[in-house]
Regions:
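Conserved substrate/cofactor phosphate-moiety recognition/catalytic segment
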Residues: 1-27
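A conditional alpha-helix N-cap/helix-loop micro-motif detector
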Residues: 8-12, 37, 91
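Short glycine-/polar-rich loops that comprise or flank the Walker A/P-loop
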Residues: 26, 50-55, 105-108
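Acidic, metal-coordinating catalytic cores used for nucleic-acid/nucleotide bond scission
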Residues: 31-40, 61
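A short acidic, amphipathic alpha-helical/loop segment
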Residues: 42-46
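A glycine- and Lys/Arg-enriched "phosphate-lid" helix/loop adjacent to the NTP-binding pocket
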Residues: 52-101
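NTP-dependent small-molecule kinase module
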Residues: 100-147
Length: 147
């Protein structure tokens, strides 16, 4: 229980199987992910084919340094650690996957700045064709990961 990184793959498999079961039962559900893997792409496509409405809420941090600092703070409070190299890799991959893969396949999406005590909506939309950008500077930082 004190080494979550050793069971993360197994936990991910369990979660994917649970999501598949919920879809087959036509249940309403939500799940949390860092978007660092493409494992959810096919599941989202299957869910959409079964008339699910896919809504994405993305909570963005404005720097990898802030992500590292928050993890350090969590560890000091007794929470689990994530190695720095993993955090750095995930930060970039998450943003790349957000703008290149997940925004285009979700019915609706909202991106929030979670860098301060007060969370702010940066942008929201229905795919990329109908979007409302509320903070152009932050949106440009995020959208810079588009390939």
């Amino acid at each position: 229980p004190f080494q979550p990184e050793k069971v993360s793959f197994q936990a991910g498999r369990i979660m994917l199987n649970r999501i598949k079961k919920l879809i087959s039962e036509r249940s309403t559900f939500a799940f949390e992910t860092t978007l660092t893997t493409k494992s959810y792409v096919n599941i989202i496509k299957v869910a959409k084919a079964k008339k699910y409405k896919i809504i994405l809420f993305y909570f963005w941090l404005n720097s990898v340094e802030l992500a590292l600092a928050r993890i350090e703070d969590r560890v000091k409070k007794g929470g689990h650690n994530i190695p720095n190299n993993v955090v750095i890799r995930r930060y970039t991959r998450s943003l790349e996957n957000l703008v290149n893969i997940f925004i285009p396949i979700c019915n609706e999406w909202s991106i929030f700045d979670n860098s301060t005590d007060k969370m702010n909506l940066i942008a929201e939309g229905t795919r990329l064709s109908n979007s409302l950008i509320l903070d152009n500077q932050q949106w440009e930082q995020i959208y810079a990961y588009k390939s």
